[in-house]
């Protein structure tokens, strides 16, 4: 196969249009740009929050002002002007919605177009959705059906009043307000997110899902998710996100906290498809996210599964703190970068409890001029006797200009535990593609098959609703690549 065909195919494959880049023309209610204590107080007032929430926010803001940006990541980006961001933006009258019937027709059409129907006739079977548009939740499906079995699933702003005992107890318990620069910012200004509580001995009958949509060009999105799985319970949670195509960068700084009590299990799956910028690296979302789970009880389990294909910048490390005896933490990830995208992502597995186990499978795919970094920490404490970790980090390079980096940090403080780590780097070779062509399979189909096989260990961990979507998404993102 000629070099010209190879390079042309690669360019075509990594330059597929972003089909979610449309803007919804709708009237907004928004705060002026900038951040100070008055803005924070206004957010709290608008949400009718109890006093403990305002205290939480103001303490976070004071801490944030004293903190510095983390500079250790393999990322290069323009300085963010935090006074040039709108910290609250919502469709007009959205704070007065009593049901989905009251939601603006344009917003319902937007979510229909995104494949997330909210109205009663079209809503997804077996998936309860909380739809968040800029700074507010515009609707939650199947709330009554979930309530019938004791599952609480609602916007976080609603939970701060309705279920204040749970929120006050667990909010900030896994990700403290001063954990890092972006977590502190989120703790000060978050305006929406999802809350979920699974009562003892209940297996949630539906998949729970939150879909995040940024629409306003001047706003950032700062959602917060809090999930608590009580004794012997189970929940599977899905997360998706998209944004319009704008020439300037927008900030997304989220926090996710998971708490699994004794014998409880939480599966948290993400398909991240924020706008990644154009082929020259202009525009796109700056995605700075803190996700952490606490396996608090004996035999508890938390699994993170993610497919990262969007964002101009991704800084994200879903992690587990394994406190419970025989607790389990898992991290399965596919991170795809192309054009000028940069991703610095990975996980932490902190073993505290005896007999705790963790597994890490990370697949990084780099194309175009992009940079893809895996950063992982495995720490086994002195009292975590009999703990086991297995890590597998594989990178694939497509084209001559992309980069892949792996930074494992391993610390074992007792002689009764075991850590296994393996890593590989590969690239799609012309010889492989030649064999496919000899069998009548096009270059695009060949690359899609090779990528699917490379990512299979992660895709099989996704719920069925996401697995098919993720496979298609990678094919679209890399449709036409190489040679």
UniProtKB/Swiss-Prot annotation:
GO terms for biological process: iron-sulfur cluster assembly. InterPro entries: Fe-S_cluster_assembly_SufBD (IPR055346), SUF_FeS_clus_asmbl_SufB (IPR010231), SUF_FeS_clus_asmbl_SufBD_core (IPR000825), SUF_FeS_clus_asmbl_SufBD_sf (IPR037284), SufBD_N (IPR045595). The keyword Plastid applies. Signal peptide: none annotated. Keywords: Chloroplast, Plastid. Transmembrane segments: none annotated. GO terms for cellular component: chloroplast. It is found in: Plastid, Chloroplast. Belongs to the iron-sulfur cluster assembly SufBD family. This is Iron-sulfur cluster assembly SufBD family protein ycf24. It comes from Guillardia theta.
């Amino acid at each position: 196969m000629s070099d010209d065909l190879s390079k042309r195919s690669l360019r075509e494959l990594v330059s597929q249009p972003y089909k979610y880049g449309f803007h919804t023309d709708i009237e907004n209610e928004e705060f002026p740009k900038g951040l100070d204590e008055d803005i924070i107080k206004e957010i709290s007032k608008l949400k009718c929050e109890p006093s403990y929430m305002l205290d939480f926010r103001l303490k976070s803001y004071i801490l944030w002002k004293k903190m510095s940006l983390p500079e250790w990541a393999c990322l290069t980006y323009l300085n963010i002007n935090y006074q040039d961001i709108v910290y609250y933006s919502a469709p007009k009258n959205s704070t007065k919605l009593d049901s989905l019937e009251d939601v603006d027709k344009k917003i319902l059409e937007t979510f229909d177009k995104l494949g997330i129907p909210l109205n009663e006739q079209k809503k997804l079977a077996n998936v309860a959705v909380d739809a968040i548009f800029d700074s507010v939740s515009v609707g939650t499906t199947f709330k009554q059906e979930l309530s019938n079995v004791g599952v609480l699933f609602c916007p976080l702003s609603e939970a701060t009043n309705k279920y204040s005992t749970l929120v006050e107890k667990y909010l900030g318990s896994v990700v403290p307000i001063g954990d890092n620069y972006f977590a502190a910012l989120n703790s000060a200004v978050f305006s929406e997110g999802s809350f979920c509580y699974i009562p003892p001995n209940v297996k949630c009958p539906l998949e729970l899902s939150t879909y995040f949509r940024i629409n306003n060009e001047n706003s950032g999105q700062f959602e917060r998710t809090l999930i608590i799985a009580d004794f012997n319970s189970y929940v599977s949670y899905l997360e998706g996100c998209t944004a319009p195509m704008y020439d300037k960068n927008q900030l997304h700084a989220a926090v996710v906290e998971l708490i699994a009590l004794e014998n409880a299990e939480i599966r948290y799956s993400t398909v991240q498809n924020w706008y990644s910028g154009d082929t020259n690296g202009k525009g796109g979302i700056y995605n700075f996210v803190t996700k952490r789970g606490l396996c608090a009880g004996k035999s508890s389990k938390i699994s993170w599964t993610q497919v990262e294909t969007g964002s101009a910048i991704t800084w994200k490390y879903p992690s587990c703190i394994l406190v419970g005896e025989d607790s389990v933490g898992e991290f399965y990830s596919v991170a795809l970068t192309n054009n000028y995208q940069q991703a610095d992502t990975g996980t932490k597995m902190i073993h505290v409890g005896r007999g705790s186990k963790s597994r890490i499978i990370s697949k990084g795919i780099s194309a175009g001029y992009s940079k893809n970094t895996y950063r992982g920490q495995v720490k086994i404490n002195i009292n975590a006797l009999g703990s086991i970790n297995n890590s597998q980090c594989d990178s694939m390079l497509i084209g001559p200009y992309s980069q892949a980096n792996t930074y494992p940090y391993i610390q074992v403080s007792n002689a009764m535990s075991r850590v296994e780590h393996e890593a590989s780097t590969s690239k799609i070779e012309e010889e492989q593609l030649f064999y496919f062509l000899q069998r009548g399979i096009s270059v695009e189909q060949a690359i899609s098959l090779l990528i699917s096989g490379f990512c299979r260990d992660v895709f099989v961990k996704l719920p069925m609703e996401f697995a098919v979507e993720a496979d298609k998404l990678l094919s679209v993102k890399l449709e036409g690549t190489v040679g």
